[in-house]
Amino acid sequence: SSSEIIKPQQKRSIKRFEKVLETAEYILKSESSYSLTIQDVAKISGMKRPSIYKFFPSNESIVDALSEKHCLKLLNLIKKNLENVNYSNVSEHYKIIIDVAAIYINQNKEISEVLFTKFAEDLLSTAISEEISRLSPNTKPIKNQIATQMFLSSLYSGFKSEKSISPAFLGESKRACLSYLSN
């Protein structure tokens, strides 16, 4: 697809790739509800457009790369928080996951939109489902996937209406997800 990200291998290229992402993040943080363009990234970063197109063939590919970067950060936090959990109760795992996700979203409000793209939803939903299946092998993968999509969409709903995840929305997201899991 036209949003394919070409990941660099060489050190110099990796630095350029990172610079594009840093600039894109800077633009998103300074302009709320802004649509990112390669032209703006080129202007602000001082990089030439052809060198940006080398890694990012489209505007969407920059957003996808930012999504991936923040999804991986969130997933690492989730895994760290689940490391010390020694019980296999799937509901307890989801409580932790939902809390960590809400905290991450609230601490990164300016760029949280990138966690709610279709690309991010697919990545998070797959990775979280796999993590839950690893911790609780008795749960059905499809059930984990649906539970994950449920809490992500309810957190997004809260984020959209309040520009953060309030304790009330967090509580309701957990209740909905846990209610589904208990059936």
Residue spans of the language-model regions?
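Amphipathic alpha-helical packing segments from all-alpha helical-bundle domains
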Residues: I96, F116-T148, A168-L178
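Helix-turn-helix
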Residues: K19, I27-S61, A65
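N-terminal intrinsically disordered/low-complexity leader segments
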Residues: S1-K15
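Alpha-helical DNA-contacting segments of helix-turn-helix folds
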Residues: L28, S61-K73, L77, L115
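Generic hydrophobic, amphipathic alpha-helix propensity
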Residues: S13-A24, V41, L66-H70, L74
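Amphipathic C-terminal alpha-helical segment
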Residues: Q107, T148-P167, L178-N183
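Hydrophobic alpha-helical connector segments
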Residues: A65, K79-N106
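Amphipathic alpha-helical segments used for helix-helix packing
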Residues: K95-L123, S157
